[in-house]
Amino acid sequence: MLRRKPSNASEKEPTQKKKLSLQRSSSFKDFAKSKPSSPVVSEKEFNLDDNIPEDDSGVPTPEDAGKSGKKLGKKWRAVISRTMNRKMGKMMVKALSEEMADTLEEGSASPTSPDYSLDSPGPEKMALAFSEQEEHELPVLSRQASTGSELCSPSPGSGSFGEEPPAPQYTGPFCGRARVHTDFTPSPYDHDSLKLQKGDVIQIIEKPPVGTWLGLLNGKVGSFKFIYVDVLPEEAVGHARPSRRQSKGKRPKPKTLHELLERIGLEEHTSTLLLNGYQTLEDFKELRETHLNELNIMDPQHRAKLLTAAELLLDYDTGSEEAEEGAESSQEPVAHTVSEPKVDIPRDSGCFEGSESGRDDAELAGTEEQLQGLSLAGAP
């Protein structure tokens, strides 16, 4: 009886094994085989302008199994790049079509419609459509930007909202003047300090005890340090003020503290001053900056007005006293001239006595000369 010899796959001939491995590699598209990278292929991977024919399926046939793996890898890379390009193009066109849906005409076919298939125009036509949509979108964006700029930028005739109307210039009162002896340039971030130049004259508005004063220079109100200035004496100006007031015929001196505060528009501080001992104008003349700090009057304009009023009141009183003294001194010579006839009588007699004694001395001198002449004549 004949027995069949068992077959073993491992005992096959080498030629059969080689053919079997070749068939397997061609059936599985040779994915496991390493592909050499080419710089030319990498540059064309995601190029939308790459023209690949539509009828080329890219699937290798059994006749191409004997060709080199390099050519097979290039074909598969081209197929993959074409598929990716189409997917990316679909996504970009879909996004643009959604944005431009309101502006496009009705009835225009959308690339994302169900009629769109793989047989649609190639990458070149898709790139052309994409560029046309970009050109169509640019004018819309430019119009939107122009309208936005027109809304944001004000017209030449209308005033801008950011600019504030200029504040009125401060006109007083002032509590003194000071001349700058040292140049000082403030920081560009410090908008409250004054730029000082040697020789400038500052009108002082307030002199707080901390050392940073408030003044007016070149039409600008700002702060400055007292170490850069020398305070100018105000005595001459203070004495001249009453005369100017009298010459101009202004209102006379107030009689009460309440009347004074009404004139300078600070009636609100009347009760504060009265409760702290400033009940008369004589008391108000002694008002100083330290007293204002004790009274908790911190408004710079109110402080300047009160201090200026106190100084003017003091100057007014001192000027009136000096005027009275001058009037008295001018009246004294008149009194002396009236009393001169009574007082000059004994003085005249005294003068006569002096003249007689002088006359006697002259006579004695004459007699002595005569005696000398006689003695000379009698000599041999």
From Swiss-Prot:
Keyword Phosphoprotein part of the UniProt annotation: yes
Acidic residues composition-biased segments: 318-327
Domain (SH3) ranges: 173-234
Record's compositionally biased regions (Basic residues): 241-255
GO BP: B cell homeostasis; B cell proliferation; CD4-positive, alpha-beta T cell differentiation; homeostasis of number of cells within a tissue; positive regulation of adaptive immune response; positive regulation of B cell proliferation; positive regulation of CD4-positive, alpha-beta T cell differentiation; positive regulation of immunoglobulin production
Entry keyword annotation includes Phosphoprotein: yes
InterPro entries, per database record: SAM (IPR001660), SAM-SH3_domain_protein (IPR051725), SAM/pointed_sf (IPR013761), SASH3_SH3 (IPR035721), SH3-like_dom_sf (IPR036028), SH3_domain (IPR001452), SPIDER (IPR021090)
Sites bearing Phosphothreonine, chain numbering: T61, T103, T112, T318
Signal peptide span: none
Annotated region described as Disordered, given as residue ranges: 1-76, 98-174, 237-256, 318-380
UniProt domain SAM: residue ranges: 252-316
Protein name: SAM and SH3 domain-containing protein 3
Organism expressing this protein natively: Homo sapiens
